[in-house]
A protein has these predicted regions:
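Structured-RNA-binding interfaces characteristic of tRNA pseudouridine synthases
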Residues: 1-206
Length: 206
């Protein structure tokens, strides 16, 4: 059977989602849990490859496995073998040819800014602090310039394989800025991203 799972994870202690030769990845830790529950270590296909330190609220992945465990029981079974910073939220069976990466037509990133001189002691790991006052109205107007299909080479960090191969055209379908008190959220939806693209985009708007 082909299982589709939804995960949430705190990426602080990981080198990213994808398995890396030198580093602790979300995928490797998740596969350890799969092996503990299923007695096998199936290949997993993630919807994206988040970078080091990036968190996920609704990350989709799929894998094929022969098991009698019903999908509704998988979240509890896997969560018992996962660290507290990775959680399976839901699981279901999908068609055999389903592939999480190819089925993900858009991906949404949320970049949070704490617009205050002093950090919050409770969630400082989940935002970037900018002490100077930011004008969210002007930021929202500027954000609209990114919407559409463009060559985003200028928003790509050095060392990107996509940039090396000239594959830097992406389509942003939505980019908006909202403020709630001292918190500013920059939310971007696109068909794909370059290395550190959202971080650089957020820095440009600020």
């Amino acid at each position: 059977m082909n299982f589709l799972l939804t995960l949430a994870y705190d990426g602080t202690n990981y080198c990213g989602f994808q398995v890396q030769p030198n580093g602790r990845s979300v995928a490797a830790v998740f596969q350890d849990a799969l092996e503990a529950v299923l007695g096998a270590r199936p290949d997993i296909k993630g919807c994206s490859r988040t970078d080091a330190g990036v968190h996920a609220l609704g990350f989709r992945l799929n894998f094929h496995a022969d098991t009698r465990i019903p999908p509704e029981k998988l979240p509890l079974a896997l969560n018992q073998h996962l660290p507290p910073d990775i959680r399976v939220l839901a699981a279901r069976v999908v068609p055999e040819d389903f592939h999480a990466r190819y089925a993900a037509h858009t991906k949404t990133y949320l970049y949070r800014i704490h617009n205050h001189p002093i950090d919050s002691p409770f969630d400082a790991a989940y935002y970037t602090r900018i002490p100077k006052h930011l004008d969210e109205v002007r930021m929202q107007a500027a954000a609209q310039q990114f919407v559409g299909t463009h060559d985003f080479l200028a928003l790509c960090a050095a060392g990107s394989s996509a940039a090396a191969h000239g594959d830097t055209v992406r389509t942003i379908t939505d980019c908006h800025v909202t403020r709630r008190g001292d918190e500013i959220d920059i939310e971007v939806t696109a068909d794909g991203y370059l290395y550190n693209m959202v971080r650089i985009l957020a820095g440009t708007l600020c």
